[in-house]
Regions:
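Short, charged/polar low-complexity linear motifs in solvent-exposed/disordered segments
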Residues: 51, 72-74, 106, 119, ...
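Beta-rich strand-turn-strand
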Residues: 82-118, 122-124
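Ribosome large-subunit tunnel/peptidyl-transferase-proximal elements
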Residues: 2-98
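Short small-residue beta-strand/loop micro-motif enriched in glycine and branched aliphatics
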Residues: 67-69, 124-127
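N-terminal nucleotide/polyanion-binding subdomain common to many enzyme families
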Residues: 1-2, 131
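Surface-exposed, charge/polar-rich loops and edge strands
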Residues: 148
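Flexible glycine-rich active-site/ligand-binding loops centered on an Asp-His dyad
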Residues: 60, 128-145
Length: 148
């Protein structure tokens, strides 16, 4: 598994309750561009339209040897999930307060581009502070155990 892009702020801004792996529909030049690590999912989000999931606001740079004239690097890209996963995701969204965020974009062992998504709930400012305090405390504990 080769990670191409990761959403590093996802764990800071959201509480992730469930993770789902989805395939992503790409053109050939987009796949070649991702193989040389020119993609980003920072600030991207997933929406549901007409019973399908779409990745919006992701950026995949145009492949330099591509001959596409009107290439849009931040176009919507369709996500491929099973019916059961889609029902689970749409149920969480309709429940309220939950959203779907992309966590990482990678190539599977078979060479397919995959997107790891998380069903998440947004954190408030005090929740973010609590998670920072908890992380710092865990670091201090490790240092104390290491020194003793």
């Amino acid at each position: 598994m080769k990670i191409i892009a990761a959403n590093n702020r996802a764990n800071y801004n959201f509480t992730i309750s469930n993770k789902i792996e989805a395939g992503i529909v790409l053109t050939g030049s987009e796949v070649k561009s991702l193989r040389i690590n020119t993609g980003s999912i920072r600030g991207s989000y997933i929406i549901e339209q007409n019973g399908e999931l779409w990745l919006s606001n992701s950026f995949i740079k145009k492949y330099q040897n591509s001959n596409e004239n009107n290439y849009d690097p931040s176009r919507k890209r369709k996500l491929l999930v099973t019916k059961r996963e889609f029902d689970k995701i749409s149920g969480s969204i309709k429940q309220g307060g939950f959203t779907i965020i992309p966590l990482s974009l990678y190539f599977s062992d078979k060479g397919f581009a995959k997107l790891s998504c998380g069903i998440a709930k947004g954190k408030k400012k005090i929740d973010k502070r609590d998670s920072i305090k908890l992380r710092d405390w865990n670091i201090k504990k490790q240092r104390l155990l290491k020194n003793n």
